[in-house]
Amino acid sequence: MVRTYGLTHINLMVRDVKRSLRFYGQVFGVEEYGRSEGLVHARTPGCQDVITFDEQASGAGESRGIAHFGFRLVSPGDIDAAVDEVERAGGTLLRRGEFSPGYPYAYVADPDGYEVEIWYE
């Protein structure tokens, strides 16, 4: 086994870096910490996880075998506010429910069509 610190980042091909940073910032609180030509690096709140937005018109929104990625809620009562925020930021609700009573989830699509799970555990 290779020793690692775990998964550190994902790289999303997006049509519009500014739009993606605005969406993920508004909905999930990610903050830009660096950029280079066509790339913006953003950290998620409370940890060192990174999302890189890679501006490329071709390939944007294509999953290429990745079904979804997720953000875990702090409180199960936050699910309604999370879905509302997604829709205000230009995303869409795909489906929602509960894994079991008191453990809600919602699958949403970002403006490029990437599927994002919002869930509580």
Predicted regions and their residues:
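Short, flexible, solvent-exposed loop/turn segments with mixed acidic/basic and small polar residues
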Residues: M1, A57-A60
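Vicinal oxygen chelate
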Residues: M1-R3, L7-R15, G61-E121
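Core segments of cupin and vicinal oxygen chelate
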Residues: T4, N11-D54
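Proline- and acidic/polar-enriched loop/turn elements at helix boundaries
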Residues: S36-E37, D78, E98
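Short beta-strand micro-motifs in enzyme catalytic cores
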Residues: G38-V40, D49, A67, G102-A106
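Conserved segment of winged-helix/HTH DNA-binding domains
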Residues: D49-I51, G59-E62
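Acetyl-CoA-dependent GNAT
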Residues: D54-S58, Y120-E121
